[in-house]
From Swiss-Prot:
The keyword NADP applies. The keyword Secreted does not apply. Keywords: Flavoprotein, FMN, Monooxygenase, NADP, Oxidoreductase. The gene is rutA. It catalyses: uracil + FMNH2 + NADH + O2 = (Z)-3-ureidoacrylate + FMN + NAD(+) + H2O + H(+); thymine + FMNH2 + NADH + O2 = (Z)-2-methylureidoacrylate + FMN + NAD(+) + H2O + H(+). Its EC number is 1.14.99.46. This is Pyrimidine monooxygenase RutA. InterPro entries: Luciferase-like_dom, Luciferase-like_sf, Pyrimidine_monooxygenase_RutA, SsuD_RutA_monooxygenase. The FMN-N(5)-oxide reacts spontaneously with NADH to produce FMN. Requires the flavin reductase RutF to regenerate FMN in vivo. GO terms for molecular function: alkanesulfonate monooxygenase activity; uracil oxygenase activity.
Length: 364
């Protein structure tokens, strides 16, 4: 099972809580996190893009770095780990993104890939005059399909003449092209998002569900399996989880309860308001899960709470779901959490024995 880290490009990571660690994003912090991930044998890191936050007492995600420039910097200081940036497709033309990706591919010597997002939070784009109108909610993946076609044509042939509804290329050129096959991630959970992923992407990222229910996401993976059966492409699912661990189950649970007790109600209310703005999509989108009040303190991602041994066992259960290629992890405290994962959790995981074995071989 592959394991990656969703690095904190925005302030405070993924906890909307006054009781959680409070910090600003910086290149130095993300460099330390990425180097630790590489040191512990993890497979990749991914950075999101967020152009406007949720406010509240914690100013949640009001402070953010930019994804491509961050990953370009990380590409220059790493040697093995794979790096994925996120493209806000309403802001950046596909030909420019194709060239930026090719540049970071060169910096990283073929270790770069791309996450495509359609944009769901109107204020992010309206503030720049780039929101195309609320009818876009229902046509996001039509737009993204043309976008991906341009990317694929430029990366694979160096040229695009696509004439679509949203993009019109006229002998558009790209050189140099990426040295490695450029992998695309999508995180769409709607039927349209799944169909897009099955047609154009290589990985589908989905939310884990619940607390200590590591296989509850299985129905989402089943839906992707059905979608990719229609296209015949090899696409695997990766699942997002937050890890809150400690020496004992009780200590980890106490931290989780403490974070929940400090939930930033104002920021959570803003999340709910933005989620409700999309009246075009169905009930199966990511934002519907994120805004659910059940566990909005960490945007309702799957949460693994327990001792190091408990978390290791829970993660080993994830890979038992057919079609699952790996997990994307976030931590309440990234630096300590990553070290604990690398030294106390990963060595106990059956699904990561190949990594611990490689580490022992290097020492020998």
């Amino acid at each position: 099972m592959n394991i990656g880290v969703f690095i904190p490009i925005g302030n405070n990571g993924w906890l909307l809580s006054e009781n959680a660690p409070q910090y600003m994003p910086s290149f130095e912090l993300n460099k330390q996190i990425t180097l630790k991930a590489e040191q512990h044998g993890l497979d990749f890191v991914l950075s999101m893009i967020k152009l406007r936050g949720f406010g509240g007492k914690t100013e949640f995600w009001d402070h953010n770095l930019e994804s491509f420039t961050l990953m370009a910097g990380l590409a220059a200081v790493t040697s093995r780990i794979k790096l994925y940036a996120t493209a806000p497709t309403l802001c950046l033309p596909p030909a420019i993104v194709a060239r930026m990706a090719s540049t970071i591919d060169s910096i990283s010597n073929g270790r770069f890939g791309l996450n495509l997002v359609t944009g769901w939070q109107r204020p992010e784009y309206a503030q720049m005059g780039l929101w195309p109108g609320d009818e876009y909610f229902g046509r996001r993946y039509e737009y993204l399909s043309e976008y991906a076609q341009v990317l694929r044509e430029l990366w694979e042939t160096g040229r695009s003449d696509l004439k679509g509804e949203f993009f019109q290329m006229e002998d558009c050129r790209l050189s140099p092209r990426p040295q490695a096959e450029m992998k695309i991630i999508c995180a769409g959970q709607s039927a349209a998002g799944m169909a897009f992923t099955a047609t154009y992407a290589d990985y589908n990222f989905c939310f884990g569900k619940g607390v200590n229910t590591p296989t509850a996401f299985a129905p989402t993976v089943e839906r992707l399996e059905e979608a990719k059966a229609k296209t015949g492409r090899d696409v695997s699912s990766y699942v997002l989880f937050m890890v809150i661990s400690d020496e004992t189950d009780e200590a980890a649970r106490a931290k989780w309860e403490h974070y929940k007790a400090g939930a930033d109600a104002e920021a959570i209310a803003w999340l709910g308001l933005q989620g409700a703005a999309d009246t075009k999509s169905g009930a199966d989108t990511n934002i519907r899960q994120m805004a659910d009040p059940t566990s909005a303190v960490n945007i309702n991602m799957g949460t693994l709470v327990g001792s190091h041994a408990t978390v290791a066992a829970l993660l080993d259960e994830v890979v038992t779901v057919p079609g699952t290629g790996g997990v994307l992890l976030v931590f309440d405290d990234f630096l300590k959490g990553l070290d604990d994962f690398g030294t106390k959790i990963q060595p106990l995981m059956r699904s990561r024995r190949h990594v611990t074995g490689e580490a022992l071989a290097e020492v020998a």
